[in-house]
């Protein structure tokens, strides 16, 4: 077929973004031509939206993905090399899950999970396999990706406020920062995310037994053990539950342990005078530009205010159009990052 805009529009309805690619080749005489459709299946989305399955590799060829009106991602196989938006060409989008600061922010929680796992391992009647220390980080990141993907799917927008676990009681009672309209009782269901992650770690180590290999993310992806499959489904459903809670007016409040404190939270901080925020230009926020907060809506301003009032809070803000921001206090400013890696194929984790 001739390669032109008309044929691409005709084929686009049959080439669903998540499952199908349009194949194009360069004929030496006639130039670009459409040779067919390639059915990829949706597994490649797991690297983006979170999930256990692994996808077959893409050929080391030019890929062009239409990610929105006037927006293109250009890549070589899975590696994104450029992004077009608003008529301008940018470098590959920021993927905050690769940033050091976000990994460090959750480091104490990962260590806590490892210590709980090691205690369970000591008490086990049979030998357990060793786990890669990084496994808990990867599982936690995929859980967060699933949560964000679920929120985007509602096309409603929402806010997650992540607070230090030692301050859970303060945020659940009367405080100057926010008021939770629908709070959860301090019991196991509130800490369900944490329970599921630790149970996954214990189950992986148990089913591998005393084999000498170290169990990591690939083993989690490839196992067919029914207990792991059930746990993975439970994480998926929990992520979608929290995503649904985010559609209620107000913020969802969690601790760094992903302990669900409540939803429908109204952010106060009225006394906080905040007129400007810093927009990060790189993963670590070493370079930034100052912007006025009056250019954004109420949802974003309230999320910025609580980060300004309480320096240990992380806000994750989703717009109705699916744009994602992470905001926190850094270098004497509230700084936000645009999480633009929604279609970044290069991110395995």
What are the roles of these predicted feature ranges?
Residues 1-349:
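Divalent-cation
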